[in-house]
């Protein structure tokens, strides 16, 4: 038996095939992006069209209020930080470490020295995937970085939240007021509908847009933040390979080349 088993082709083929697969995954990821976004827009346009026909002169603001208050994935990273901050305040010695001005690495080292700190770090690590795959910017550019590879960012937010909690402030996002205004607006307009047929049309369009409207923001987290963070990291692995072989100076230098040029470099 020969190990590793011969494949009949060079390992360089796997390398180029893997890069091509990454490119195709980006195309596929953005197909999902527009699938989510365009379906949301379609549902909103249909609901807006029904509303304008039933309520001539209705404002765009009123239509917007009737679909507001969707719970979206983009809120989740902030919620995880809030939960971690409350947990820190409830643990002995944890809040004091998190409020210090030292970098994240120093705080982690200090937390690992105490039992409650270790327990808090376990909760932090559990929250990281997928919710800390959040870009430090728009998510569109490789140089923006992400929470997952720059822990000073989430630790900085947690420091602020802990301080606010100790001052008696509320740190969680509240949709209660928005949801109340939404439900009241829908109820008021629904009272104006005279026929069962029109009411059925309104309810159908409204239920549809309320069901899928969250995707207007969900695509933002899952594609432009989570997916892009992973994709950029995979491209950097190719950059590291090129550095090791003397082709470029730094892993991020690979981003200077387009998707047609990189296979040529890999071939070399």
Predicted stretch roles:
Residues 1-268:
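Contiguous hydrophobic, helix-prone segments at protein termini
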